[in-house]
C-alpha cells in the first residue's frame, strides 16, 4: 500500500523513494511472467513485519509493542519479501537506506539484526554492526540489547556479552557483534548481515 500511496502522491516522498516504489510495483507485474527471475513472497514480507511488531520498545514510561510505520514496513517487507524464483534466496544482497536524524535507522537495523540473527533459519551467521568509532557501532548494538532485555521470551533466544559487544543467537549459533573501524578485526569473516 505504501508504494501505491507514494506513486499516487498521497504520501509525499523524495525522488529516490518514488523510484523505489515504482520499481516495486513494476517488478510485481514483471514477476507474473515466467522469464522474470524474482517474485514477491508476501508471507516472508509479513513474517518480518509481524516479528518487528512483536518487539517491545523499552524506552519511556511504559513498555509497548512496536508499531511499524508504512515506510518501515516497505523497507523490511521489500528486503525480506523479494526472492529468487529458482531457489527462494533473498533478491537484495545489499541495500542503502537513508533517513534523517532521529528517524529510526538504528531501530530498523536492530530489528533486522534480531530477525536475521535467530529467526530466518540461517545457521552460524555473522552479523556485524560497524562504524568508524566503537561508540557509533554500539548505537545499533545497544538497540538490539534493548529489544532483547525488554522481552522475557526474546531474551531466552539470545545471550548478551556487553563486555565485548557480542550477542550469541542461541537458536542458530549465529553471532551479532559491534565493531569499530579496525578493518583487521573483519579479516576472514563472511558477514551474513553487515550494518554500516
For each feature predicted by the language model, list its residue ranges.
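Phosphate/NTP-binding elements of NTP-utilizing enzymes
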Residues: 1-196
Amino acid at each position: 500500500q505504501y508504494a501505491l500511496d507514494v506513486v499516487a502522491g498521497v504520501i509525499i516522498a523524495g525522488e529516490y523513494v518514488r523510484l523505489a516504489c515504482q520499481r516495486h510495483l513494476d517488478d510485481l507485474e514483471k514477476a507474473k511472467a515466467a522469464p522474470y527471475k524474482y517474485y514477491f513472497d508476501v508471507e516472508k514480507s509479513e513474517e518480518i513485519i509481524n516479528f518487528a511488531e512483536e518487539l517491545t520498545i523499552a524506552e519511556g514510561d511504559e513498555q509497548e509493542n512496536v508499531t511499524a510505520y508504512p515506510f518501515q514496513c516497505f523497507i523490511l517487507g521489500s528486503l525480506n519479501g523479494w526472492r529468487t524464483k529458482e531457489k527462494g534466496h533473498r533478491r537484495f544482497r545489499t541495500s542503502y537506506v537513508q533517513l534523517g536524524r532521529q528517524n529510526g535507522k538504528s531501530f530498523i537495523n536492530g530489528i533486522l539484526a534480531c530477525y536475521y540473527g535467530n529467526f530466518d533459519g540461517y545457521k552460524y551467521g555473522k552479523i556485524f554492526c560497524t562504524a568508524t568509532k566503537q561508540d557509533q557501532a554500539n548505537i545499533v548494538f545497544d538497540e538490539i540489547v534493548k529489544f532483547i532485555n525488554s522481552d522475557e521470551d526474546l531474551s531466552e533466544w539470545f545471550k548478551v556479552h556487553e563486555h565485548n559487544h557480542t550477542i550469541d543467537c542461541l537458536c542458530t549459533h549465529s553471532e551479532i557483534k559491534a565493531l569499530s573501524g579496525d578493518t583487521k578485526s573483519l579479516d576472514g569473516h563472511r558477514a551474513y548481515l553487515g550494518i554500516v
